[in-house]
Regions:
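N-terminal signal peptide c-region/cleavage motif recognized by signal peptidases
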Residues: 13-15
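A generic "folded-domain core" signal
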Residues: 17-165
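Sec-dependent signal peptide recognition
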Residues: 1-7
Length: 165
């Protein structure tokens, strides 16, 4: 597991290099400052095979506060139109808004509830049905998630206050 976490931190750092600054990397999560948005990002435990989409999840924070803790997930498969996409954090379910292979939280109240649930630790999974009607789940470990969320939020708050450029 430690090798996986170290590998993820390296991947996050490399990916962020081209598109932002890594603020934190630990556990299975990283916080990245992209200038117009700061994100806490995690990768699914299921590693995508070559040519397939890697499932990721994250929380977005914008200095102008248009988005503050917005949850988003890139699904490993395209969700069947009209089907439910549900985020499970521990035993708590959250119905997400979805289009194609992306899903989002539905607003500030749900976003805060998701962040509170993530702080409780444990596991997280995004469940949906693919175009063929087959149910799938993209699982995530939450180790490092709370720190990544706090780091991303703090970084964007500093940017909004003019403390960093």
């Amino acid at each position: 597991m430690k090798a996986f976490c170290a590998f993820f931190a390296l991947l996050a750092a490399g990916a962020a290099d081209a598109r932002g600054t890594v603020v934190f990397a630990g556990g299975g999560w990283a916080a990245v400052d992209r200038g117009d948005v700061c994100e806490a990002l995690g990768r699914s435990e299921k590693i995508a095979v070559r040519g397939r989409v890697q499932a990721t999840a994250g929380f977005a924070f914008a200095p102008d506060r248009r988005r503050w803790g917005e949850f988003h997930a890139r699904l490993s498969r395209v969700a069947r139109p009209g089907s439910s996409v549900i985020l499970h954090v521990g035993t708590l379910p959250f119905l997400l808004v979805a289009r194609g292979d992306w899903a989002w939280s539905s607003g500030p109240v749900q976003e805060q509830a998701i962040i509170d649930a993530v702080r409780g630790g444990g596991r997280m999974g995004v469940e949906a049905r693919d175009l063929g009607g087959v149910r799938f789940t993209d699982p995530y470990v939450l180790e490092g998630a709370a720190t990544a969320i706090d780091s991303a939020a703090a970084r964007c708050a500093l940017r909004a206050a003019g403390k960093i450029r």
